[in-house]
A protein has these predicted regions:
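Class I S-adenosyl-L-methionine
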Residues: 1-124
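Class I SAM-dependent methyltransferase SAM-binding "motif I" and its flanking Rossmann-like core
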Residues: 101-160
Length: 160
């Protein structure tokens, strides 16, 4: 267990990038390696999620725990994951919750973190930003995303 023991743990949302393990940042690699527990969201207990797959390739010696977050029962599954996280925090653990892209943009992590904060106001929650898919796509295409006074807006496809 890390030095967090006895003082309350910390939940760290770790962005693992858009899918290529080589696009995990050094800070993300360190956060995963230094965690007491690494949690990876999945749609089912026996299904390897994309974030888990990336971490397995980048950090093959790290033990990963799958946490199920199902779209049809999202609220109930988020509650279950949040309860597991709170138990880890109460035990003083450093928990890394890995997610595709960036943990603060359209991420399962942000939903889980919000629920954890409801259950444990004042819980220590940190994020490690990750490279997002649009950044990788622009790099592959050799396209500049924006320059100078141009603006960028992120809009979910769910908006219709």
């Amino acid at each position: 267990m890390t030095e967090q023991a006895g003082r309350g743990g910390v939940l760290v949302g770790v962005g693992v990038g858009p899918g290529d393990p080589e696009l995990m940042t050094l800070r993300a690699l360190r956060a995963v390696r230094e965690a007491d527990r690494v949690l990876a969201p999945s749609s089912a207990v026996d299904a390897v999620g994309r974030a888990e797959s990336i971490v397995r390739q980048a950090c093959p010696d790290v033990r990963i725990e799958r946490v199920v977050v199902t779209m049809g029962r999202a609220e109930a599954s988020v509650d279950a994951v949040a309860a597991e996280v709170v138990a880890g925090l109460d035990a003083g653990q450093r928990l890394a919750f890995v997610t595709l892209g960036d943990p603060n943009v359209y991420s399962t992590f942000s939903t889980v973190a919000a629920r954890v904060r409801e259950l444990r106001p004042g819980a220590r929650v940190e994020t490690v930003p990750g490279i997002m898919a649009f950044q990788e796509l622009a790099a592959r295409a050799g396209t500049v995303v924006l320059q100078h006074a141009e603006r960028l807006a992120l809009v979910t496809a769910l908006d219709g």
